[in-house]
Amino acid sequence: VPLSSMEKKERKGFLGTLYELTRDQSVRDNPDRVETYIPPGIETKAIYYNAYDFKYPQLSKVFCPAPNYSAFICGDTPLMKITTNVKNGKKIAVVKNSMGNAFVVYLISHYEQIYVVDFRYSKHNLLKIMKDAQVNDLVFAVGMYAAVSRGTIGMMRNLAYQKNQDYDEVLKQEQAQRLLDSINGVQD
């Protein structure tokens, strides 16, 4: 999708983590901006789950009116599932910290489902989710400074061994809900 065909939103005055940590006046005098590009014709539905299980899913958004990185996928949540109107059967899991939030939105034009896992907060078993949901692709979207730390590597490794509710049960519940919705004439 060409950038020129996308709706652009710009938020000025973004200071970010560097300013938070240093309170440096030169950073404050030269704030950054957050630019959001929304592809035309792409519809999304985002649901986030708490850190430990799949109970109490909450509706969310892919684009939010925040003046910072929370403009992308509304910030950091342990696990988010984004469903789009792209019908190509492709599914991806993104393991990320906050640096990956902006990357996730670029995937909505290319994937039917996107599973976003913040390795800092999620206690879900990523391998189980990928198997149950038949995820095709996996990408790590992590800032370089964090990617090489022992703590980050340990948290990412834990995603393969953590125990939680079977995601297969969530998929069955979603399938049953879609069937009920189709009987009642409700569309996504």
Locations of regions flagged by a protein language model:
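Extracellular glycan-modifying ectodomains
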Residues: 1-188
